[in-house]
Amino acid sequence: MPVSAPSPPRLHSPFIHCPINFTPSSFSARNLRSPSTSYPRIKAELDPNTVVAISVGVASVALGIGIPVFYETQIDNAAKRENTQPCFPCNGTGAQKCRLCVGSGNVTVELGGGEKEVSNCINCDGAGSLTCTTCQGSGVQPRYLDRREFKDDD
């Protein structure tokens, strides 16, 4: 007995629904199609993965817009407040002790044989202190975004 080949499976798509059949009663003057013509109707079904993907996309866009707006409002509010916090490195004085002469203004060099030479500090020009690099001498702690580039005084 000969074995027949199986027929190919009928293609099925979840997006194509049963075709619409037009009957003479559904035919009206505004519908110009012939009654025997039928077209497939497309329907969309959302599976849970698609719903999750769309939700994540919408949430990402909302956060992408919301976070910068939040930061801008915080910056604006901080700019309106008065800043009276004393500078931390200089304790509000606006000057820091020179690290080379340790605030004395003089540098002592031992030449040997018991001889010493005392000269003015070349870092602070004998003043013993330098302008604070954090507050630029104002004595007020700058806000984070107002800080200048750090200048190393060594």
From Swiss-Prot:
Catalytically driven reaction(s): Catalyzes the rearrangement of -S-S- bonds in proteins
Summary of the knockout phenotype: Lower maximum photochemical efficiency of photosystem II after high-light treatment.
Transit peptide: 1-43
Keywords: Chloroplast, Isomerase, Membrane, Metal-binding, Plastid, Repeat, Thylakoid, Transit peptide, Transmembrane, Transmembrane helix, Zinc, Zinc-finger
Transmembrane segments: 51-71
Protein localization: Plastid, Chloroplast thylakoid membrane
Membrane protein topology class: Single-pass membrane protein
Gene Ontology annotations of biological process type: photosystem II repair
Coiled coil: none
Pfam families documented for this protein: DUF5351 (PF17302)
Zinc finger (CR-type) residue numbers: 77-147
Cofactor note: Binds 2 Zn(2+) ions per monomer.
One GO CC term on file: chloroplast thylakoid
Entry similarity comment: Belongs to the BSD2 chaperone family.
Domain notes: Its sequence is related to the DnaJ family but lacks the J domain. The CR-type-like region is similar to CR-type zinc-fingers and was shown to bind zinc.
Role summary: Protein disulfide-isomerase probably involved upon formation of a complex with HHL1 in maintaining photosystem II (PSII) activity under high light by regulating repair and reassembly of PSII complexes.
Protein name as annotated: Protein disulfide-isomerase LQY1, chloroplastic
Record organism: Arabidopsis thaliana (Mouse-ear cress)
Lineage: Eukaryota, Viridiplantae, Streptophyta, Embryophyta, Tracheophyta
Gene designation per UniProt: LQY1
